[in-house]
Amino acid sequence: SYFNRIINIPNYSFEGKQTASFSEASYTHIKEKTEWVAGANLWSDNFQEKQLDTFPLRNYNQITFGAFAQNSWKATKWLNLETGFRADYVIDYGIALLPRVSALFKITDKFSSRLGGGFGYKTPTIFTEESERIQYQNVMPIDKNINKLERSYGGNVDFNYRTVFGEKVTFSINQLFFYTYLNNPLLLEYQTGGLYQFINSSGHIDTRGTETNIKIGYDDFKLFLGYTFTDTRLHQNGILTNTPLTPKHRINSVLMYEVEDKWKVGLEAYYFSPQKLSDGATGKQYVLCGFMVEKLWEKFSVYINFENFLDARQTRFDTIYTGTVTNPVFRDIYAPLDGFLINGGIKLKL
């Protein structure tokens, strides 16, 4: 992949080219009750900044070698086990060992549960939401002698139930509980002389929450309802703070009408609760709504979308910068900047 990063604001410019590649080779061995997959991969990420002033260049070349093995085992009629282990060697940052496990319990024909967990990591980079907010201005390069991998440990459990009422109404519900522990999170800290430096915190971030998804079907209608609660906190030096740009409450709802090979009609609405911002303020709550219609024929279809038809955008209920137009200080973008959009088209089947 190739990404040309260019930012131009009054009295400051940022420009650079980012390229990334991924390659993998794997071998699969399948038997009656088990399946093995093993392989290796190579991942690269390179960024070269254009020298526009005397500020240190934020160039980097990240290369990761990995090897993995995973197994799926139908232990019994009611238990499926999936296990895996991955070892990555990240040049300049060392080895990351990543086990994972997942168990699916088929308790009845209508009720099942899944329990899982695993490790993860992230390589330090200047390209984060925090640094993007200030257009990477005065952000010092990542220092491989100071910075290190962010390592995460997580687990989740979910419960699934499905049934039919009166032979016409289908109902299913999924209830998920999750927890993630992020050790040594990478934080952007203000330094002397107006500079910013990414520092790995000595603390941690923990994220816990629940997610509920309901699906109801009747004839050609389907209703999807969802609710997500997320509580994310930074533990640092004995102080507990909520992390920014994480709404605690999200609600989604989608109503679909679909006649196979004839019509598709959809109405959707999404709610986002107030959330803490990086500058200490609290963002506003907002709702996004959309409507879509598609008419299908044998060889083609015609569709039209009405996106965000309530015209919810951050510039209507909050600011996106402080200061002057010629010398702005940009705030977090937590809601759409585009308002009501209409788009349509024709799909051809060849």
Model regions and ranges:
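Membrane-embedded beta-barrel scaffold of Gram-negative outer-membrane proteins
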Residues: 1-8, 106, 114, 148-208, ...
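Face-selective signature of the C-terminal outer-membrane beta-barrel domain
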Residues: 1-93, 106, 165, 169-177, ...
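Surface-exposed extracellular loop regions of Gram-negative outer-membrane beta-barrel proteins
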Residues: 46, 58, 91-96, 110-156, ...
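Gram-negative outer-membrane beta-barrel transporters
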Residues: 74-77, 172-182, 200-277, 347-349
